[in-house]
């Protein structure tokens, strides 16, 4: 009887103790996370000191698996002398565009404004060795236009921020208001067209304000001056061509006259040469005749009449042949 009474008493005492312990644990405050959330307003903190950043999304299973490891890594941040942060790409699409995050989870190391992509697993031991052994020094940094602090990535952040706002607005239409998705798409198409027309109108107004049109009279004068200038230019070109033609004709005429004069000079020279040759031949014939006469006087009676008349005849034939050859040569030169 006593044993049966003790069992319920012990059970009641154990339940009371468990309830009291649960109340004490509930009364204790939750342990504060050492991971610092990063937003578009405070992300510049990573430009100073050494940081490790994690980009995640609440719906990403891989991101959820590394949450506990990331918290452990953040708790030991003081020992490692490093700050640990995280970025929710759903709430901060601009930062995901600034770091050009395309896969989740994504990890980045920052040292005095120089960023590097960490591509290892999100396990505490690997993260700790990455910092202690300074493995980040062997990783190529994001420099130039790839750097999150560059002007290019600032523009990319603006584009991602606008796309995030459009996505939130689409969810508001389809989830909160219950509007069909195709109605939301039609709304965005119309809004895009209206925005384009509005921007075009603004550009036209700006051009009209800053680019003052010329008066009509001045524009007509400019056109007349331009037409007269073109006509004068055409006339000058025509005159120049005519002058060239005239000069070419005069040159041709002068060249023809010079050729004719040269031909006449050549003919006169040939005639003079022929006269000189004829005179020379006549002198030769006279000398030969005188020689024959002298020989005839010396050798009177010793030479027969046939021999006496044969020698002058032979010399005369030779002279005539020479004259004929000379004339034929001159005729060939003239032709």
UniProtKB/Swiss-Prot annotation:
PROSITE patterns: THIOREDOXIN_1 (PS00194), THIOREDOXIN_2 (PS51352). Residues 1-20 form the signal peptide. Residues 238-280 have a biased composition (Acidic residues). Its main location: nucleus. The chain crosses the membrane at residues 186-206. It comes from the Eukaryota. InterPro entries: Thioredoxin-like_sf, Thioredoxin_CS, Thioredoxin_domain, TMX_domain-containing. The active site is at residues 60, 63. Disulfide bonds join 60-63. The modification Phosphoserine is found at residues 247, 255. This is Thioredoxin-related transmembrane protein 4. It comes from Mus musculus (Mouse).
